[in-house]
Structure formats: structure tokens, C-alpha cells
Amino acid sequence: MVREEVAGSTQTLQWKCVESRVDSKRLYYGRFILSPLRKGQADTVGIALRRALLGEIEGTCITRAKFGSVPHEYSTIAGIEESVQEILLNLKEIVLRSNLYGVRDASICVKGPRYITAQDIILPPSVEIVDTAQPIANLTEPIDFCIELQIKRDRGYQTELRKNYQDGSYPIDAVSMPVRNVNYSIFSCGNGNEKHEILFLEIWTNGSLTPKEALYEASRNLIDLFLPFLHAEEEGTSFEENKNRFTPPLFTFQKRLTNLKKNKKGIPLNCIFIDQLELPSRTYNCLKRANIHTLLDLLSKTEEDLMRIESFRMEDRKQIWDTLEKYLPMDLLKNKLSF
């Protein structure tokens, strides 16, 4: 993420594609802008869209292959140059395009000698191959080669446990991530009170959908996440109707920190260094990068300040409070700690 100062004028909020190109069958690029945004809004939108694009977009891939009586994935098959493991890795790289849901069957059945590519996969009508030239295997002898495949539409990266199946069926780690990379940059425009921000968003996809299609799907997914809040009042949801549902504790992390700050007597917080708290190295490094060195520094930050720290996660927030409770008993927290 990059910030720069540029000259600009205030306009109605709008977005447009400023660059679009196809670098190869499996690499599409798009660059978009959204403006004008108030200070801080570009970061909010950029972070949300980046996460939604990388983790919420659905993709179709091969998830299982059945070779017949093959003892294990490191086996070699007579007349085939590649091992079973190499063939599985090649199948994992095949990029598919579809709108199917659930599991579908596909297959490969050819006779050597010849090269096998993605074009040789027999697919259901609803599935297309993005790059038919992707290699799968090389048959060096006149043998019959048949594989049964399973295809699934999903999202994210799904790792399968490696097992030796007696029927020769092997799982393939599913990479259902059509968006290969996302980058955003923020440019500040105007002067004084007229200052606003422009968000530039760059998207690279694997060719199964265009960057514009990916942006639309990510935006739709984000909207769907917030819809329950918009309809909650209309549905007349009450505590009585939802008494069996989980309710987050009212005593939040931020309230706990606020209570600590209210204490005026006791151990000086600027004499307690975060090194003494025995925090996990990941949490400790996040705090150090944000120039938080003492307990006073930590308690001077709001919950929002902490969540804005690079690489800081919800788990880090919980770890900080759990550590404070462990090393500083609640009666001490309530009565003795001070600034």
C-alpha cells in the first residue's frame, strides 16, 4: 500500500477501470480507482476489498484423481515419464472456469505415445478449460492411460490428508483462488478542508474470471456480510427470541483497558516493559514495530489503534489481555496500577 499527494478536485463518489490487459491465458490484470473518499475511508475500503478478493472469491479446480491399482503417490507407471505425484501436481495447476456447485466427475482416457494436456480432459458441459495447453503427462509407450477426476467449486485453499486408497484414488490440494494478487495504493488530493483520497486497486487473476468480475463478486460478498445488520430491526429480533444464541461478553477488551487507565496509584506503568510480559513473539514484534515498549504505551492505545498495527490480529488482542490477567491479578489491575 502506497500513499502519495496529488492534485485533484472533489467529485461524486465513483469508480472506473483505468487499465485492463491480458498478459497470458492464465494472467489477467486490471487497475481501478474509487474517489473521492474522506480521509481514512480509502484504507477501510482497500483492506476489506483486498481480503475479500483473496479469500472470498469462488473457484473451480480438480480435487481428486483415481489411477486404478497404484500403491502410493510416489509410484511410477510403466510407459509414463512422470510419477503419480508429478501428475497430481500438474492436475492441481489446471485452471477451470465454471458456475457449477457440488462435485462433478471428469476423466482422461488416451492411448500413447503422446503428450497429455488439459485439452484431453473430458469435462461436464458446465466446465471450461482456461488454458488447454497446460501439461499433464508424457506417454512414452503405446499404453492405454485412464484417470477418473473429481471437480469441485469452493473458495480458499483446502489441504487434504494424504492417504493410500486401495482403489488408487488420491486427493489433490484444492486451490480455489482465482485472484492471484491484489495491491492497493492511496493518493491524497486537494488542500485544507477540501482534502480527500483516491483509492487505486490492482487485481491479477488466473484467467477463470476477469479482474472486473472478481471485483464485482468481492463487493457483493462484502455487502452480503452487512445485510443482517440492516434487516435486524425489520425482523424484530429480540433477546427473548434469541436467548439460546451466543451473545458476546459485554465487558470488552476496550472497556478493560479503560478500567486500567482509571487507576491513579500503584506501580508506574512506564516501568513495566512488554518484554516482561512474556508475550508470544508474533504479538511482541507487532507491538515493538508500533513503538510500544512499556505497559503505559500499550494502555495508551485504543482498541482501534491496536487493530491498525500492521499484521496485528484478533488473536493478538486476546493474547495481550490474557497475559495481563495472568501476570497482573484483577485486584491489582483494579486497585493498584497507575500511569
UniProtKB/Swiss-Prot annotation:
SUPFAM superfamilies: C-terminal domain of RNA polymerase alpha subunit, Insert subdomain of RNA polymerase alpha subunit, RBP11-like subunits of RNA polymerase. It is an enzyme of class 2 (transferase). Disulfide bonds: none annotated. It is found in: Plastid, Chloroplast. Coiled coil: none annotated. Signal peptide: none annotated. InterPro entries: DNA-dir_RNA_pol_insert (IPR011262), DNA-dir_RNA_pol_RpoA/D/Rpb3 (IPR011263), DNA-dir_RpoA (IPR011773), RBP11-like (IPR036603), RNAP_asu_C (IPR011260), RNApol_insert_sf (IPR036643). One of its GO terms (molecular function) is DNA-directed RNA polymerase activity. Residues 1-233 are annotated as: Alpha N-terminal domain (alpha-NTD). Its EC number is 2.7.7.6. GO terms for cellular component: chloroplast; DNA-directed RNA polymerase complex; mitochondrion. It catalyses: RNA(n) + a ribonucleoside 5'-triphosphate = RNA(n+1) + diphosphate. The keyword Transferase applies. Belongs to the RNA polymerase alpha chain family. In plastids the minimal PEP RNA polymerase catalytic core is composed of four subunits: alpha, beta, beta', and beta''. When a (nuclear-encoded) sigma factor is associated with the core the holoenzyme is formed, which can initiate transcription. The N-terminal domain is essential for RNAP assembly and basal transcription, whereas the C-terminal domain is involved in interaction with transcriptional regulators and with upstream promoter elements. This is DNA-directed RNA polymerase subunit alpha.
